[in-house]
Each structure stands twice: as C-alpha cells, then as structure tokens.
C-alpha cells in the first residue's frame, strides 16, 4: 500500500523511502534513496502525504509540538526532541519501545502465574527470544499473544496489536 501511495516502482524503493521519511530525511536524501534529486524527493514526499492526509496531519502536529523541545509519548511521559525533523521518528520509536516494554511486563506476569519454564535470552528491537521447555512452547506462544492484547488495552490504544511466535532450536529458525 505504501508503495502505491508513494507511486514507487519497487517494494525495495518503497521500504527505503518509508524509513527515510520516518527518520526525518529531507528532499535531497529522499530523492537520492530513490535514484533522483531533491526535486524528485520533494515531489515524492508531497505525493505520499497528499495520499495519506492523516499522516500529514500527524507529522505537522508533532513537528509543531516539538518546537517546545518535548512531545508527549504514548504513556504520557515527555520525550525530548533533538531536532524538529526527527520529531515523528522520536514519537514512533518511543511508542515502539513503550509497547515492547509493557508487553514484556504482561508476559512476565502471565509466565509467573502459569508456571511456564522460560528464560529471556535476547531482546532485539521489537522481538524477544526466549528459551522455553518443549512441553510449554504452545502455552507460552499463547501467553505472548494474550499479553500483547492486554498491552493494547493497558495503553489505551484504539488500534489492536497482534504478535506471532515461532519455535525452533536456533535463532535462524525463529527469525
């Protein structure tokens, strides 16, 4: 959908554009990542935002709010803004971190209650790796899903979140 909204030819171009846009890249950088110049970058950004008016409103509101030096995060805390162009990224990255931390809290509560044999071995961005006894894999998988639903509710989110789990003996099998 983002590829179509931006009018880009390939999924790779769209993915690179989206990340550059969300990280606050300006027209020159956006033009460069899609094989063009600043004019192309400006046209692409304008087209994308005209096709996604709510995103434009969010970006404009967050950029304006960032002029105070902070913005309000998903859980109410204040996030410090280093630069207005990075304000949307700060909000989104902050939300992701808050969701993942709350999700881990809810998983821990449920794991203790269920008596599941599990150890956290890695936390990478929005992914957790656990060592789980074979007998508990399916039950633990359901705990992770239920904890994410509870996280959505705890944080008062209007958009439901979901997650998936994979079982394997190596990180490669579970990633």
What are these regions (language model features)?
Residues 1-175:
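Conserved catalytic core of nucleotide polymerization and phosphodiester-bond processing enzymes
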